[in-house]
Each structure stands twice: as structure tokens, then as C-alpha cells.
Amino acid sequence: SCLVGSEMCIRDSNLSVLDASGNQLVAIPPEIGMLTSLSALFLFDNQLTILPPEIGTLYQLEMLGIEGNPLQPNLYEIIKQEGTQALVAYLRDSCPVPVPPPEREWISLDMDLPPMSAEEDEAYTFAVLSYNILCEKYATAQMYGYTPSWALAWDYRKECILQELVSYNAEFFCLQEVEMGQFYDYFEPKLNQHGYEGIYWPKSRARTMRDDERQHVDGCATFFKTDTFELVDKHLIEFNQIALQRPDFKKTQDIFNRVMTKDNVACIGMLEHRKAGYKIIVANAHMHWNPEFRDVKLVQAAMLMEQLEMLGNQFAKRPSQVKCHENFKPPNYASGQQIPTLVCGDFNSTPDSGVYEFLSKGSAPGNH
């Protein structure tokens, strides 16, 4: 990187040391914040009167040299009393609130369907939102060192999340990393006020914990509009418990041990449309996170689809619970494959992964 006048030319974002001392600089451009690999930044003996808040994004900075500049006394006091990282944190937390990101673009699935009336179009069209909300215990300053503390604070984030959910007015919300306490104390009562009902299960570890510890275990939450859909049944899928029941897994000790130790879950909702009478299955899953366990993620995805097939076949045989509108004829289902199924979640997978190939194509080669 080089400083030219008051402009910065970014050449190497992996730069670890930058010395711009004694250059008569009167300002540091905001682009300095792009050099997030900096561990040392020397700005001695310039003409700086302020430091840009973008220095706050330099979360790996261990040495900041600012002596010899006509800066505000409080900046010198912070670095003298508490050190470089305290000054970086101060600049990070005092940065102006950025412009909100653009609204998300919805993916519209225009199926090749026969012409429908306005009433039918309304009944058979719905919106689905899937969102990993990053639970409080994972949103640490160590993990997100470039983020202001006020933006990481759960009290701030949960209100933003709720506001965003309500603004989209979708028929289904599939949320991951929802702590048990936050589901029952915050999201469920708040979304109830907007006409939603929720399904929730935490990760399997919650069963062995005390009540106070259990409140901080995260899991999957699915919300649906109660004036549009009626919940018929719900199911918990615990991937490690399914693995325990699979004799073919026990034949391969390595995969059995790798899958059994991961307590990821999926929650399944079986619903019926109140007006049109059709059935729908909504699956909400959170797969294991570690990139080193790609095989485990693929096994979890396969178990999810296997369970959905079994549950779907059972659901197809159940008589309808709702009395649909006179303008609609409730469909009959020969098997679960005929029931519309939504598979949502955080799969911790990329488009070149076995999980993506399996879910998009129905199979994955053994050498993936």
C-alpha cells in the first residue's frame, strides 16, 4: 500500500506493517479500513487532527503510533492508559451508522402451471424466508472483531431481526441458531402478535442440561401464518439418533463416530392450507458447520431426505383436517412425493459441495 497526499492506493490487502510517519499527512483516507491484516500502523510526526473511524475495522492491529500529531487529547489518553486495541475499539464503536444494505432480492419460482383465477393464484402463491440469525453466544468480539460492540449486542440485533421478519410478511419463516430462551421469551410472543405460530426444537444436547443451561442452546424455529395454514403435525429429526438406529452405519466405525458426535437437528412441519385444502411439508435444518466434516454434512442431508420421504408418505394417507373453501377441491395424494415440500436451512455448504449436488440433483457420486 502507499499513501499519496491524502489518498490511499490499496495494493496488498495482506499487508501487515504500514509506516507512513513523517509525511506531513493532514488526513488518513477511509480506505485504510480495507487493510484488515495490519498488525502495525505507524503515523508518527504528521499533521493529523483526527483519525478516521475506519481504523476501527483493523481488529488485528497491535501497534498504532500516533505521537507527533495535533490530535484530540482524548485519543492520546486512551492509547496511553489502555493501549492500541482500546483506541481501535473506541474508533470502531464511534463510527457512524452505515447506509443500510439494499433490500434482498426475492427468488421467484414461476412454475409452468395452467392459468389460474385470482383466488387460486392467491391460495397457491406464498413467500418463504430462511435466515440464520446468529445466536448471542456465537456473536463474540473475538469472532467478529471488525464489528462495533453495539452492532453485536443481542438486544440491538434481535429487534432488527424481528423488524426485518415482520416487514417481509412471508407465509413461512425458517430460522436457525435460535436460542431456546429467545424463542419462548421473545420471538414466539412477538410473532404471535403478527399472526404467526411457531415450531421449535433445540439441538440434542439440551436434553442433558439443567433448565438454566438449556435456555442458551440454539436450534431451529419455523413460523407460519395461522390465518393461511393450519398445523397438522410436527416432527423432530435428530441426526445422531437416526444414525444410532442405522445398522449399516455401525459397520463403518469411523463414519458412525463422526456422525454420532454431532447433535444437529431439523424440525418438520406438516400443514394444510385453510382455504384450498392442500398439504405442505416445511423442513428446517441446520447442518454441521466444520468444513473438515463434509462427509457428515452429506450423510445428514441424506438422512433428512430419507426421513422426509417416510413422513411424507404417512402424511399423504392422513385425512384432511381443514374444511376447504367451496371453490376448491382438496387434492388426494397417492404418496408423499406429490405433497409440496420446502427444504430450508443452513447447510453450511457451497455450490461445489456434495450436499448441494445431492439436494439439487438427487444423488452425489461416491468420490465427491
Residues of each region from the PLM?
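Acidic/histidine-rich helix-loop elements
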Residues: 134-155, 240-254, 258-259
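Leucine-rich repeat
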Residues: 11-15, 34-37, 57-61, 81-87
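Short, small-residue-biased leader/transition segments that mark boundaries at the very start
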Residues: 2-10
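Metal-dependent phosphoesterases centered on the DNase I-like endonuclease/exonuclease/phosphatase
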Residues: 192-194, 292-368
